[in-house]
């Protein structure tokens, strides 16, 4: 090959299309979901599992359509979904308003951290069902008990993540801002909170996962609406299709929250 032709080939290599890592991850996620769906279909189609224990996919679509049109136990499907959403959102709002400020305080003040940490670590490992009877005795069977149970599940993960994020803030940045005359509030607002935001959002994601798993326990308390109530009530009548539809709806809503928080984390806390 002539030298000038070889030089041209080296200087102008043929571009190759490379698949991005994100594309591979999406393909892997889609393949796993498809494989699970095929396994589910085969198990019900060929009789590997009795439909009483695992309804076929077409049965679930029929149950969802029936629930959408007729509702369940004197409430529409939207009312069940809306009631559960409202309970989780109220608990989430209360957790954000209390856990984040207390987490900042624990991260900035070692004395406050030493005082609050044993209390949080004492109740955090206790399953919500364990203190559910106490909540009913103390606060009755109204909405407060349901929201409070979910709130307690959300509070500890968010508090611990916030405190850890504040402790990891670079102290040289804090000192630099203070040397410029910033007040304590300005340091917290413009330095500490933005720096701790990735950990706070991660804690929020973990807390919401725990909160949604506590929803069913919360709706044990004399509820007549909600997805958790629907699942428990249908289980008593062996309406497995309604049980699975309720579980899948809870999972879908929780996944939507998770994906939304991931987007917020990428958009506003990419440095974490």
Question: Language model features by range: what are they?
Answer:
Residues 61, 74, 78, 82, ...:
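Alpha-helical membrane-protein architecture signal
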Residues 148, 152, 184-218, 241-245, ...:
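Transmembrane alpha-helices
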Residues 161-206, 227, 231:
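Short cytoplasmic-facing helical segments at TM-TM junctions of multi-pass membrane proteins
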Residues 17-18, 46-93:
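Periplasmic/extracellular loop-to-transmembrane helix junction in inner-membrane transport proteins
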Residues 137, 213-250, 269-272:
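Glycine-rich helix-loop "coupling/hinge" segments at transmembrane-helix boundaries
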Residues 121-157, 164-165:
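Generic hydrophobic transmembrane alpha-helix motif, especially the helices
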Residues 1-34, 259-272:
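Transmembrane alpha-helical segments of polytopic membrane transport and secretion proteins
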Residues 90-120:
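Transmembrane-helix boundary motif in ABC transporter permease subunits
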């Amino acid at each position: 090959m002539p030298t000038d032709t070889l030089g041209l080939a080296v200087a102008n290599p043929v571009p190759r299309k490379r698949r991005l890592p994100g594309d591979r991850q999406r393909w892997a996620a889609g393949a796993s979901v498809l494989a699970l769906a095929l396994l589910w279909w085969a198990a019900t189609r060929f009789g590997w599992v009795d439909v009483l224990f695992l309804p076929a996919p077409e049965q679930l679509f029929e149950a969802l359509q029936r629930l959408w049109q007729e509702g369940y136990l004197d409430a529409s499907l939207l009312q069940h979904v809306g009631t559960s959403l409202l309970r989780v959102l109220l608990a989430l709002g209360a957790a954000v308003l209390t856990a984040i400020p207390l987490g900042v305080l624990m991260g900035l003040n070692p004395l406050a951290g030493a005082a609050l940490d044993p209390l949080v670590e004492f109740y955090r490992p206790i399953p919500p069902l364990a203190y559910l009877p106490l909540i009913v005795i103390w606060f009755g069977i109204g909405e407060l008990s349901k929201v409070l149970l979910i709130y307690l599940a959300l509070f500890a993960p968010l508090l611990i993540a916030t405190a850890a994020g504040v402790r990891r803030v670079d102290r040289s940045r804090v000192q630099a801002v203070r040397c410029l005359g910033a007040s304590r509030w300005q340091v917290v607002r413009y330095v500490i909170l933005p720096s701790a935001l990735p950990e706070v959002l991660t804690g929020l994601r973990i807390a919401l996962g725990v909160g949604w798993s506590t929803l069913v326990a919360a709706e044990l308390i004399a509820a007549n609406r909600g997805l958790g109530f629907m699942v428990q009530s249908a289980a008593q009548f062996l309406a497995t299709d309604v049980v699975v539809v309720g579980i899948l709806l809870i999972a879908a809503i929780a996944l939507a929250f998770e994906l939304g928080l991931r987007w917020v984390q990428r958009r506003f806390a990419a440095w974490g």
